[in-house]
Amino acid sequence: MKIFIGWDSREKIAYQVCRASLLKHTTVSLDITPIKQKDMRDRNLYWRGHDPMSSTEFTFTRFLTPYLADYKGWAVFMDCDFFWRGDISTVMDYRDHSNAVMVVKHDYVPKEATKMDGAIQTQYPRKNWSSFMLINCDHDQVKQNLTLNTVNNESGLHLHRLQWATDDCIGNLPVAYNYLEGWHTKDDCPNPLAVHFTRGGPWFVDYMDVEYGDEWIKTSRGLVNE
């Protein structure tokens, strides 16, 4: 199973814990690849100029996922601030080949004006849909509309609103695969498979007491002790 994780040099521990939690719970073999912006630039796959509104180094490189998967089969992209409590392979049960991409369709409106590191918290329709994507890399809309030129030249809103796919080709996934800490509650999903620390995770002092933060900290300590 192909997994791509956004990598940010400022949040290495977040990536490490995300990866460890994936491996802890999976029942299938995972091919996990961090998408590092420097590597993408070195390979001439990414040449966008710096966007001061980008809150992470993978704000746009995430959309290289189909290219990196050779436009074959299904691939998952997720932000590095995900923490897995269950088996990611179960998401494959929701595959619908008529769809170009499948996401959790939250109606998310951030309460905070800034993100965990002080970056401006921009608001736009379909916010956070692109933070976890099950992508049908064989789909015509993906192959035609998520090219290198698209990723490097289209606007951020075009990419993050998934406007490279028609609405009828954007499938829905359960909240369990992208539970937004601070937004969702146990009424929405009593036992999430993946917690997304989108406001800020326990690797930041001010966010150590967030929901499911104790589980993240326990996993991170296990990595340190290995």
Regions of interest found by a model, annotated:
Residues 61-110:
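GT-A fold catalytic core of metal-dependent nucleotide-sugar glycosyltransferases
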Residues 94-158:
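Conserved catalytic core of nucleotide-sugar-dependent glycosyltransferases
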Residues 30-69:
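Active-site-proximal specificity loops/subdomain of glycosyltransferases
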Residues 11-12, 84:
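Alpha-helix N-cap/loop-to-helix initiation residues
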Residues 45-53, 115-120, 187-190:
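Short, surface-exposed amphipathic charged segments that create phosphate/polyanion-binding patches used
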Residues 1, 62-63, 72-73, 98-99, ...:
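Short, surface-exposed beta-edge/turn micro-motifs
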Residues 1-4, 10, 16, 28, ...:
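A glycosyltransferase accessory/donor-loop signature
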Residues 21-29:
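Short, acidic, metal-binding catalytic loop of nucleotide-sugar glycosyltransferases
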